[in-house]
Amino acid sequence: MPVAETSQGTSGVAERYASSLFELALEAGTVEAVQVELDKFGALLDESDDLKRLVASPVFSAEDQFKAISAICEKAGIAGLAVNFLKVVANNRRLFAVPGMIRAYRTIAAAHRGEITAEVTSAHALDEAQETELKAALKSVTGKDVAISVTVDPSILGGLIVKVGSRQIDTSLRTKLSTLKLALKEVG
């Protein structure tokens, strides 16, 4: 679990940075473009253990992180406000909070569009058809357009965990097995 998900202080940092970035993107008229670029960086982060270590480890200096982020963004074609933002974050030694910043930006942008954001945890990546079906199901329940933020966590074994606002629906196999284990302990 990334540091950004385990610390309340980090959440505040992530939200402040995301809010500042959103204001700049709104002024520049690039809210959607910045979200696409951040999502691209988030996908790189999900796929690369080395990048996760760079982001999470205090061992790397701000200069090392800045150079690495610059090179990664250039190679990935991440440009404009998003790359400048990531460089500032690296310079300020806040890369550990980038996953939270991306989630917070996505939530702020969705709220600006009149959508709500659902955080979805799945044991494996969802294909486009599954995402579309999930969005439709959530829209029928909430009555609003829903943007989904998918996190892959193989430890849930199967099923989904869906968080919309303060509500959570946990259909993960891990939770079902834990419930069964507790029930069996009570019986025997």
From Swiss-Prot:
NCBIfam families referenced in this protein's UniProt entry, alphabetically: ATP_synt_delta, PRK05758.2-2, PRK05758.3-2
Q: Which gene encodes it?
A: atpH
Keyword set includes Membrane: yes
Assigned GO CC terms: plasma membrane; proton-transporting ATP synthase complex
- Return the similarity comment: Belongs to the ATPase delta chain family.
Subunit comment: F-type ATPases have 2 components, F(1) - the catalytic core - and F(0) - the membrane proton channel. F(1) has five subunits: alpha(3), beta(3), gamma(1), delta(1), epsilon(1). F(0) has three main subunits: a(1), b(2) and c(10-14). The alpha and beta chains form an alternating ring which encloses part of the gamma chain. F(1) is attached to F(0) by a central stalk formed by the gamma and epsilon chains, while a peripheral stalk is formed by the delta and b chains.
Say which species the protein is native to.
Agrobacterium fabrum (strain C58 / ATCC 33970)
One annotated GO molecular function: proton-transporting ATP synthase activity, rotational mechanism
Locations listed in the record: Cell inner membrane
- Name of the molecule in the record: ATP synthase subunit delta
| InterPro entries per UniProt | ATP_synth_OSCP/delta_N_sf, ATPase_OSCP/d_CS, ATPase_OSCP/dsu
Q: Which Pfam families match?
A: OSCP (PF00213)
Q: Which UniProt keywords apply?
A: ATP synthesis, Cell inner membrane, Cell membrane, CF(1), Hydrogen ion transport, Ion transport, Membrane, Transport
Q: How does it sit in the membrane?
A: Peripheral membrane protein
What does the protein in this record do?
F(1)F(0) ATP synthase produces ATP from ADP in the presence of a proton or sodium gradient. F-type ATPases consist of two structural domains, F(1) containing the extramembraneous catalytic core and F(0) containing the membrane proton channel, linked together by a central stalk and a peripheral stalk. During catalysis, ATP synthesis in the catalytic domain of F(1) is coupled via a rotary mechanism of the central stalk subunits to proton translocation.
